């Protein structure tokens, strides 16, 4: 269990919002928000999605607002 042998180096994930030039995350854009929520309804962490800390905070607020407005479910299907 000391280390990986012959494994590839992990590629750094690029922030989706910085790459596409998105500065404002709208809570009404449900299709965009669904990409960052698991099938169980949980917000995916940064290490999984690759978003920067700045946009992860904005994304979390937008998802919580969308849930409050009943645009997104609190729990998955």
Curated annotation (Swiss-Prot):
Entry-linked InterPro entries: Ribosomal_bS18, Ribosomal_bS18_CS, Ribosomal_bS18_sf
Keyword Ribonucleoprotein attached: yes
GO biological process per UniProt: translation
Keyword tags: Ribonucleoprotein, Ribosomal protein, RNA-binding, rRNA-binding
Record keyword Ribonucleoprotein present: yes
Domain of life, per lineage: Bacteria
GO cellular component, one term: cytosolic small ribosomal subunit
Molecular function as annotated in GO: small ribosomal subunit rRNA binding; structural constituent of ribosome
Family from the record: Belongs to the bacterial ribosomal protein bS18 family.
Subunit structure: Part of the 30S ribosomal subunit. Forms a tight heterodimer with protein bS6.
NCBIfam families: S18 (TIGR00165)
Role description: Binds as a heterodimer with protein bS6 to the central domain of the 16S rRNA, where it helps stabilize the platform of the 30S subunit.
Protein name in the entry: Small ribosomal subunit protein bS18
Record organism: Bacillus cytotoxicus (strain DSM 22905 / CIP 110041 / 391-98 / NVH 391-98)
């Amino acid at each position: 269990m000391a280390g990986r042998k012959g494994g590839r180096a992990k590629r750094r994930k690029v922030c989706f919002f910085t790459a596409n030039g998105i500065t404002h995350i709208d809570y009404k854009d449900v299709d965009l928000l669904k990409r960052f929520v698991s099938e169980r309804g949980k917000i995916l962490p940064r290490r999984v999605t690759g978003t920067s800390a700045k946009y992860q905070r904005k994304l979390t607020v937008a998802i919580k607002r969308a849930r409050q407005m009943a645009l997104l479910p609190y729990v998955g299907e």
